[in-house]
Amino acid sequence: WKSSNLAPERLPHYATISDLSPVLRTPNVTFINLQYVSFEEDLNKISNELGIEVHNFDDLDHYNDIDDVAALCLSLDLVVSTKTTVPFISAGVGTSTKLANWKQSPWNNVLSNLNGPKIDVFERDTLDPWDNVFTSIAHDILKYANKRRS
């Protein structure tokens, strides 16, 4: 949901942990942390405010141990992320990836967006909140989960 690069021009790419509430409230889903910087406070907030546990592997160095992060991504059914390193890794290992993306100019999106068979992009315009993006992703997760159960 955020990057190690929080320069002002990069901030529109990232969501707050509260913005992810529609996804986090999806029933019958186990959540695994792939966030690589400053996540402890956010995970506590999710637990305290939403009553949802996001599992974190304390022995995994999310920032420096890319091989283990890739292996973890490979073991997951799907990944939800904003435009950080995470979706590049998850899609790269073949895991279905839902990308919450800030829609910029068409050329910028064509040149810098992830693309491929394992990426589903959900976009928001510059002045729009993230609500619709994460609600749409939550609906997609429910469809995916229902399909796997049947």
Report the location of each language-model feature.
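Catalytic machinery of carbohydrate-active enzymes
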Residues: W1-S150
